[in-house]
């Protein structure tokens, strides 16, 4: 995972050198998303050996962080590649699409970090019967 993150960061650095002002928000949000992903990955790796249930409890939000960051990275690559394709409507849409994703969707990665690293205490606080009672009562409302 660390190698994958390092590859994304290195590719981002190379693109940053070529990208202009239009890529500012993409660059900022992708950098923040990568930081969140690296921190959350570090927590997962440190916690996994001693508390695998906590890692399992956080696995879904952790994978969502990965998806958001990789999506932003791929859209940024696509927008940069499309810059030289004048007259192509699909190419022209790449930059606004990447910017929209970076500004509207990618920031959710920061919010998911807390859920990914919250641990398993509350997940296992209720036994199965008690949880079933809660679900049945809630369904009636």
Residue ranges and their predicted role:
Residues 7-141:
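C-terminal amphipathic alpha-helical interaction region
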